Amino acid sequence: MSSQCPFSHLAATNLTMGNGAPVADNQNSLTAGPRGPLLAQDLWLNEKLADFVREVIPERRMHAKGSGAFGTFTVTHDITKYTRAKIFSEVGKKTEMFARFTTVAGERGAADAERDIRGFALKFYTEEGNWDLVGNNTPVFFLRDPRKFPDLNKAVKRDPRTNMRSATNNWDFWTLLPEALHQVTVVMSDRGIPASYRHMHGFGSHTYSFWNEAGERFWVKFHFRTQQGIKNLTDAEAAEIIANDRESHQRDLYEAIERGDFPKWTLFVQIMPEADAEKVPYHPFDLTKVWSKKDYPLIEVGEFELNRNPENFFADVEQSAFAPSNLVPGIGASPDRMLQARLFNYADAQRYRLGVNYRQIPVNRPRCPVHSNQRDGQGRVDGNYGSLPHYEPNSFSQWQQQPDFAEPPLRINGDAAHWDYRNDDNDYFSQPRALFNLMNAEQKQSLFNNTAAAMGDAPDFIKYRHIRNCHWCDAAYGEGVAKALGLTVEDALKARDTDPALGQGGLL
């Protein structure tokens, strides 16, 4: 490592206050005599203290701990028959981008190497506006209805009494949502602790839509395959790393980019014709399900490379704001309930965290012209469009709507009601069963051991509940988890009749 000062190239400058006035003394406070009290007229002390207590902004409710980098996306294959989005308009086209990778459940001070999902958020600065793809390193999630998302957050965060993470709360919640078993199986598998952000895949997870110049709609899933190869950590390896370095993932990403070892991912899509959504044997908009790659194979699109670290972490990573509602012509949403809720909730979270004008922060600012009647608000710094009219319609030919970019109509029918997913699709186990059966014996044993370790001191009735769910998924799955927990499947099946949650819909 070089011993040279990293700022040796900068010319000496003078320290000023926030208003530009010179700071005469930055070492000693203004006092009445050498041993007297402070004076209220010490303007620089007042400013430093006032700014200091306001430096921390609200942390993200989820995905609080993260790392980021800038890069470039390059199109390598033609998909214009599926989408009119200009980011994909020609082979060889390059688009600047920013990526943020995260843990999910932990706070800003959490260790990078914890067993957890990893966030995989990408912002593409396209000529038609910013496109945000806000995904994870897993293709599925615990939930399929957003009503339970705040509850998930509370279950995996700190207990309101002890202020500690609670295996009881966590597993009580998961085991009463049988649809969560698919994601639980992923998180408790070897892939539950990636060795680094560079060595994991990414997924859009949700079903999105494409539409082309002819107005044809296709449903789409996004997959990002790491070109560095998959590498994971065992619980023991992760514990050793955490004991010495809580920023292991951030350090790995930053140092790789600094030495010119730029990480890359290949983008693939799965494409489903619009009409197929009513024909497939599974719910194509269910976030707890994946699509068959046999029926809808991966189609290569391009690759992205991360090649520039932020100059200031707070400015670019902490203030980066991602929202699935940041879409561009040719890329749209779907009836996925979880996605529908995120279309509002994510942008609203950024308004709370960063203010209504968060899009003016450089890392979030579109690279294309922005002509909007949205005005004023705290932190407006772009001139606020001066004296231009801020209403529409107006008589001055200003900023007309663009009907050529309208999304094709989507046929929707049905009565408005609180429709229960379980009445529509109660196949909780076929896909986690398929995943389990893809594992070799060693991987299955890791799954059993990791599950037992994660369940920790949760009460037996919760452990029995999870054993039952695993048993109904696959007998060998249930048997393996039971043995790792020092319990039996037989006792778990008997324990159902005395489960405290008896009568709840999620108790199977």
UniProtKB/Swiss-Prot annotation:
It holds the Pfam family Catalase-rel. GO terms for molecular function: catalase activity; heme binding; metal ion binding. Transmembrane segments: none annotated. Keywords: Cytoplasm, Heme, Hydrogen peroxide, Iron, Metal-binding, Oxidoreductase, Peroxidase. Induction: By hydrogen peroxide. It catalyses: 2 H2O2 = O2 + 2 H2O. GO terms for biological process: hydrogen peroxide catabolic process; response to hydrogen peroxide. PROSITE patterns: CATALASE_1, CATALASE_2, CATALASE_3. InterPro entries: Catalase, Catalase_3, Catalase_AS, Catalase_clade1/3, Catalase_core, Catalase_haem_BS, Catalase_immune_responsive, Catalase_sf. Its EC number is 1.11.1.6. Belongs to the catalase family. Homohexamer. This is Catalase. It comes from Haemophilus influenzae (strain ATCC 51907 / DSM 11121 / KW20 / Rd).
